Amino acid sequence: MTNMSWSFLTRLLEEIHNHSTFVGKVWLTVLVVFRIVLTAVGGEAIYSDEQAKFTCNTRQPGCDNVCYDAFAPLSHVRFWVFQIVVISTPSVMYLGYAVHRLARASEQERRRALRRRPGPRRAPRAHLPPPHAGWPEPADLGEEEPMLGLGEEEEEEETGAAEGAGEEAEEAGAEEACTKAVGADGKAAGTPGPTGQHDGRRRIQREGLMRVYVAQLVARAAFEVAFLVGQYLLYGFEVRPFFPCSRQPCPHVVDCFVSRPTEKTVFLLVMYVVSCLCLLLNLCEMAHLGLGSAQDAVRGRRGPPASAPAPAPRPPPCAFPAAAAGLACPPDYSLVVRAAERARAHDQNLANLALQALRDGAAAGDRDRDSSPCVGLPAASRGPPRAGAPASRTGSATSAGTVGEQGRPGTHERPGAKPRAGSEKGSASSRDGKTTVWI
């Protein structure tokens, strides 16, 4: 008994702590601290010499052993050890059932998670036809889209990597989903939260362990009552200083003396109190479960609480103003182009703007000529030409690209210069008083 180890039973009881209510955790604390520790530390030290120092006033061989057997049919310490083991047996059986039940639920949830796995890799996106018949394909323009192709390759690589990682972490995800589904939710399993506070009762109900839990509570309470009655019948409420014995082979009634009777009496009363406290905790836990179930039933009959009013619908996103008609892009136009092609597109836009300005200037010149009193005069006698209009009949052509060049430092117009050959060109000249525009 001096080398008795309680580690195995303590580990089992600590595991029960994870599947019990708040009152059950208090009962477990009382059992471990006041019963196991007191019995292992105090009881062993107090009752270690109970038989060695139990002496009788006779020299008859065997009389001392017979009288001690009559005084204590079962040693106090061994009785309390047996009591702890028997009372802990229902809890250990409940723990075994709970672990088995949760393991089966975990396996079922893992299989469901495997069935809910996503399908195979999606097919590559088909090449979309041009939205309008008049718009050519990007290949017809001789333009490449390297960044778009790179993006597709990266997307495929990321998809493959994600699927590989998903296959590697398949079982871990299934176990995590099972833990969440089975009842590992802290807010619903006994931890205080903003929505409410409870002590594990709902978790036991959710795991389907309520009947087994109540059964082990009833068994524990019955064992407590039985051991209280047995302890009273065996030892009473005190350890008497001397014990009269008349059993054979004692020649007559002899008096036997017990060592440290007061200390043993105090310890015996402490064990009575601990047993009564454990019995009271069992009764309180059963009452707690009954009242909690009754409250849940009443709330279920009343119906769910009124839900909060639905939030107001969010306004639609702001509509941004559309781009100008002359600069609008097709819906599938890609802005991801190379730097040289961006410059080319910029020059093309400048040429289009210059051409539009020339057309507007020509139209304004025709209106002025029709309204001028000197209609028959030659063009040279009408004064200097307006800005943006051709200078003379045989003057040099004005390149449309010079509009962009005027904004560039260090560039000057040269009369007679030809348009650049890398972009679309537009110029205008005046022949016979008419304006001709070509691109």
Curated annotation (Swiss-Prot):
Places the protein is found: Cell membrane; Cell junction, Gap junction
A UniProt-annotated Pfam family: Connexin
Entry GO MF terms: gap junction channel activity; gap junction channel activity involved in cell communication by electrical coupling
Database matches in PROSITE patterns: CONNEXINS_1, CONNEXINS_2
Oligomer and partners: A connexon is composed of a hexamer of connexins. Interacts with TJP1.
PANTHER family per record: CONNEXIN, GAP JUNCTION GAMMA-2 PROTEIN
Illness: Leukodystrophy, hypomyelinating, 2: An autosomal recessive hypomyelinating leukodystrophy with symptoms of Pelizaeus-Merzbacher disease. Clinically characterized by nystagmus, impaired motor development, ataxia, choreoathetotic movements, dysarthria, and progressive spasticity.
Protein name, per record: Gap junction gamma-2 protein
The organism's taxonomic lineage, starting at the top: Eukaryota, Metazoa, Chordata, Craniata, Vertebrata
